Amino acid sequence: MPQLNPGPWFAILVFSWLVFLTIIPTKILSHISPNEPTPVSAEKHKTESWDWPW
């Protein structure tokens, strides 16, 4: 019975886990945080306050 021969199946198992542990986490992490947070600038806005003309 060839299905009891662990040679080819073990290689397939190791290769599939290698794919899961190297490629899949990078794909998942890129979707979890797609954008880097932009730093908040400490500059004051250049708009000036104005009063209502009444």
Swiss-Prot record:
Highest rank taxon of the organism: Eukaryota
Keyword vocabulary terms for this entry: ATP synthesis, CF(0), Hydrogen ion transport, Ion transport, Membrane, Mitochondrion, Transmembrane, Transmembrane helix, Transport
Is Manganese given among the entry's keywords? no
Q: How does it sit in the membrane?
A: Single-pass membrane protein
Basic and acidic residues biased stretches:
42-54
Q: Which GO terms describe its cellular component?
A: mitochondrial membrane; proton-transporting ATP synthase complex
Per the record, which residues fall in region Disordered?
35-54
* One Pfam family linked to the record: ATP-synt_8
Instruction: Enumerate the GO terms in the molecular function aspect.
Output: proton transmembrane transporter activity
Parts of the chain that traverse the membrane: 4-24
GO BP of this protein: proton motive force-driven ATP synthesis
Cystine bridges: none
Localization terms from the record: Mitochondrion membrane
The family database entries (PANTHER family) matched by this protein are listed as: ATP SYNTHASE PROTEIN 8
Subunit text: Component of the ATP synthase complex composed at least of ATP5F1A/subunit alpha, ATP5F1B/subunit beta, ATP5MC1/subunit c (homooctomer), MT-ATP6/subunit a, MT-ATP8/subunit 8, ATP5ME/subunit e, ATP5MF/subunit f, ATP5MG/subunit g, ATP5MK/subunit k, ATP5MJ/subunit j, ATP5F1C/subunit gamma, ATP5F1D/subunit delta, ATP5F1E/subunit epsilon, ATP5PF/subunit F6, ATP5PB/subunit b, ATP5PD/subunit d, ATP5PO/subunit OSCP.
Q: What does this protein do?
A: Subunit 8, of the mitochondrial membrane ATP synthase complex (F(1)F(0) ATP synthase or Complex V) that produces ATP from ADP in the presence of a proton gradient across the membrane which is generated by electron transport complexes of the respiratory chain. ATP synthase complex consist of a soluble F(1) head domain - the catalytic core - and a membrane F(1) domain - the membrane proton channel. These two domains are linked by a central stalk rotating inside the F(1) region and a stationary peripheral stalk.
Family to which this protein belongs: Belongs to the ATPase protein 8 family.
What name has this protein been given in UniProt? ATP synthase F(0) complex subunit 8
Q: Which organism is it from?
A: Carassius auratus (Goldfish)
As recorded in Swiss-Prot or TrEMBL, the protein's gene is named mt-atp8
